[in-house]
């Protein structure tokens, strides 16, 4: 899959509220007011989606906060795989 250029990334970010770029990766922090178990349930849903897509994000869990970072390592940057997984994470956060 081809790397996205800066314009493509800006367009994608406009459709992905709360996502940003950090160290060349798409990054977002989700907060679950319900607490730790809600955060873990979200991570479980993301894990299934990531495995199905064969595209695995970096995940950091801090009690009720989950930080997701995605990048296509094989391509050396952000691709459509990353924006697709970011959108899926947003969908799963409200599931």
Q: Could you describe each region identified by the protein language model?
A:
Residues 50-73:
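Mid-chain, well-packed structural core segment of small domains
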Residues 26-33:
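Short, well-ordered beta-strand elements within core beta-sheets of diverse protein domains
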Residues 67-92:
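C-terminal structural segments of small proteins and small subunits
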Residues 18, 45-57, 95:
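Short arginine-rich
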Residues 1-23:
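Short acidic N-proximal helix/loop "leader" segments that mark the beginning
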Residues 44-45, 87:
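Solvent-exposed alpha-helix faces
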């Amino acid at each position: 899959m081809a790397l996205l250029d800066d314009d493509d990334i800006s367009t994608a970010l406009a459709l992905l509220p709360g996502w940003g770029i950090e160290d060349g990766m798409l990054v977002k922090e989700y907060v679950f007011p319900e607490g730790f178990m809600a955060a873990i349930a979200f991570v479980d849903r993301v894990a299934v989606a990531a495995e199905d897509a064969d595209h695995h994000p970096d995940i950091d869990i801090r009690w009720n906060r989950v930080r997701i970072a995605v990048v296509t390592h094989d391509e050396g940057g952000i691709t459509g795989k990353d924006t697709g997984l970011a959108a899926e994470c947003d969908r799963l956060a409200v599931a």
